């Protein structure tokens, strides 16, 4: 049951729709594919729909340095009344749009800057951050874009004032390391609640994120909780795991070879794989002006097509990267929806394997066998279609040109991470990553310098963890150590200088936060905190844990993966 505070009145939805009918015609390309309020009264609408032309005018006026500010603003009264006032006042002499916004909306508060106690080690600093980054939103203001959740949760930090899907798994690794299993359980419960409420886990708990998900790490979260609670966790969340899988596979039963539907594709040989997809094809409310400018820069493409590809890249977590573009220097050439990502399909393989394990734990052997069969079929499809034999690494498949892409990215490590790679191929991936992506400060996301944040020279904590654990899974301990040691050194040097952990790092050297992208570098930072704690355990023996990165590189990693390799690794 969805709490009443996140419902929208049918009458209000219809009133807004009728009141704005004439004005919204101007913005038809922005809202044409938004969900019809009358068709689903359970789904709250994002601010660009609730506020129509007012939202567009405020964002285009660039009243705030960050477009996310107004997307997160809370109307002080019924949006219908605010819109009526706006229509009456906007053409009057002396009308001040900023004053109108200040009177009618509560803007998000800037978070207080956290000043850590002097002399803290890296571990002490991270442990002290957990309560600082913890939020509770059981109740939210009416018309708020924030979606309530039943339990407390940890946010990434900075401008990210809400929970994010894939970020949270890496944050939870750190929470578990800090023995905050109660917080791990709370966050898994929140995601299970979202699956029950919306049919999927949205990008984040905002109304404007409901049209897409993110990399599907829920299975990993449940497996993590099962390390503490045993198979009871698997049995408890089996229904939500099944619903998550149904979301990603929706429409597969009607697909013919060569067809796609939302997040699922069927290749010409009948292989079934997945892609990222956003249900809307409008500018993102949190990046409204930027998306409109991107679409205008390429008049040869329909704006709605560009908007959906931008949104789908946000769903991938890699927003943005040359990985999704025809021209790495031109964002408007993005075509995320025509690319089958290797990392997404590795994660869905893991979801299928977890479903098999959870079904077996629940005593349903027949269903477990069915999920195992689906996982085996996906593994074969990954090996057949997402392996670049010429280059010697896993890569994405190009639906537009019906061929494997040549670009090497850190996503190539995901089949190793989920134990879905053949052993000889894993060795080739390790060699390629070491030769082309490994830098003094860690693993680069790609080797392309596009100015986008998911490209060189940036390295991101979750990709360092995926690489290190994936390489360990296949006995590539030397390369795993290099990734771990170099990234930790980068984190430590940056912390020594700035007394903070950041969202991303420049891995071309050590001690510098990353750049590029749509917003300034953010600190906090949830997934960096989690990965740092786990990596500290990798380089320090269990009998002598370290609170900071040692000055001397250890000879070998002290921990080994706990996951059982699949048949492909034997």
Swiss-Prot record:
Substrate binds at residues 159, 166-167, 203, 212-214, 284-286, 317, 518. It holds the Pfam family Trehalase. SUPFAM superfamilies: Six-hairpin glycosidases. It catalyses: alpha,alpha-trehalose + H2O = alpha-D-glucose + beta-D-glucose. GO terms for biological process: cellular hyperosmotic response; trehalose catabolic process. GO terms for molecular function: alpha,alpha-trehalase activity. The keyword Hydrolase applies. The keyword Cytoplasm does not apply. Its EC number is 3.2.1.28. InterPro entries: 6-hairpin_glycosidase_sf, 6hp_glycosidase-like_sf, Glyco_hydro_37, Glyco_hydro_37_CS, Trehalase_periplasmic. It is found in: Periplasm. This is Periplasmic trehalase. The active site is at residues 319, 503. Residues 1-34 form the signal peptide. Belongs to the glycosyl hydrolase 37 family. Residues 554-570 have a biased composition (Low complexity). GO terms for cellular component: periplasmic space. The gene is treA. PANTHER family: TREHALASE. It is an enzyme of class 3 (hydrolase).
């Amino acid at each position: 049951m969805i709490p009443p505070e996140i419902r929208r009145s049918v009458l209000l939805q219809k009133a807004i729709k009728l009141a704005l009918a004439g004005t919204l015609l101007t913005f038809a390309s922005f809202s044409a594919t938004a969900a019809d309020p009358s068709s689903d009264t359970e789904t709250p609408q994002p601010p660009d729909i609730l506020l129509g032309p007012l939202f567009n005018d405020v964002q285009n006026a660039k009243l705030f340095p960050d477009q996310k500010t107004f997307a997160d603003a809370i109307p002080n009264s019924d949006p219908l009344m605010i819109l009526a006032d706006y229509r009456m006042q906007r053409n009057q002499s002396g009308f001040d749009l900023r004053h109108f916004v200040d009177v009618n909306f509560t803007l998000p508060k800037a978070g207080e800057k956290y000043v850590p106690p002097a002399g803290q080690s890296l571990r002490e600093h991270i442990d002290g951050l957990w309560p600082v980054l913890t939020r509770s939103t059981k109740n939210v203001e009416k018309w708020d874009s924030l979606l309530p959740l039943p339990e407390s949760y940890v946010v990434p930090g900075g401008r990210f004032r809400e929970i994010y899907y894939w970020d949270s798994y890496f944050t939870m690794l750190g929470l578990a390391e800090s023995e905050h299993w109660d917080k791990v359980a709370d966050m898994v419960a929140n995601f299970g609640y979202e699956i029950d409420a919306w049919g999927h886990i949205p990008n984040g708990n905002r109304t404007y994120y409901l049209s897409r998900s993110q990399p599907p790490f829920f299975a990993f979260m449940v497996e993590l909780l099962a390390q503490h609670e045993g198979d009871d966790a698997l049995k408890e969340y089996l229904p939500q795991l099944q619903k998550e899988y149904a979301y990603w596979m929706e429409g597969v039963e009607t697909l013919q070879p060569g067809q796609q539907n939302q997040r699922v594709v069927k290749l010409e040989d009948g292989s079934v794989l997945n892609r990222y997809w956003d249900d809307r094809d409008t500018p993102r409310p949190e990046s409204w002006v930027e998306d409109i400018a991107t679409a205008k820069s390429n008049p040869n493409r329909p704006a709605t097509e560009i908007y959906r590809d931008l949104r789908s890249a946000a769903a991938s977590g890699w927003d943005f990267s040359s990985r999704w573009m025809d021209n790495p220097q031109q964002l408007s050439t993005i075509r995320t929806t025509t690319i089958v990502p290797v990392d997404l399909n590795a994660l869905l393989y893991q979801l299928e394997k977890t479903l098999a394990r959870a079904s077996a734990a629940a005593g349903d052997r027949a269903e477990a066998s069915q999920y195992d069969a689906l996982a085996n079929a996906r593994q074969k499809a990954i090996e057949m279609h997402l392996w670049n034999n010429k280059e010697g690494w896993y890569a994405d498949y190009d639906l537009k040109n019906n061929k494997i892409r040549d670009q090497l990215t850190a996503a190539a490590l995901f089949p190793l991470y989920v134990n879905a790679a053949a052993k000889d191929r894993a060795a080739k991936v390790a060699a390629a990553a070491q030769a082309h992506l490994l830098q003094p400060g860690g693993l680069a996301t790609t080797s392309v310098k596009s100015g986008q944040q998911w490209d060189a020279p940036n390295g991101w904590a979750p990709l360092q963890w995926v690489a290190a654990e994936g390489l360990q899974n296949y006995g590539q301990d030397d390369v795993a150590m290099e990734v771990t040691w170099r990234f930790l050194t980068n984190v430590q040097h940056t912390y020594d200088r700035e007394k903070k952990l950041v969202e991303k790092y420049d891995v071309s050297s050590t001690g510098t936060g990353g750049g590029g992208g749509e917003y300034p570098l953010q600190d906090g930072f949830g997934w960096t905190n989690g990965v740092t704690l786990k990596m500290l355990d990798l380089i320090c023996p269990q009998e002598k844990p370290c609170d900071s990165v040692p000055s001397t590189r250890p000879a070998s990693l002290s921990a080994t993966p706990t996951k059982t390799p699949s048949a492909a690794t034997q």
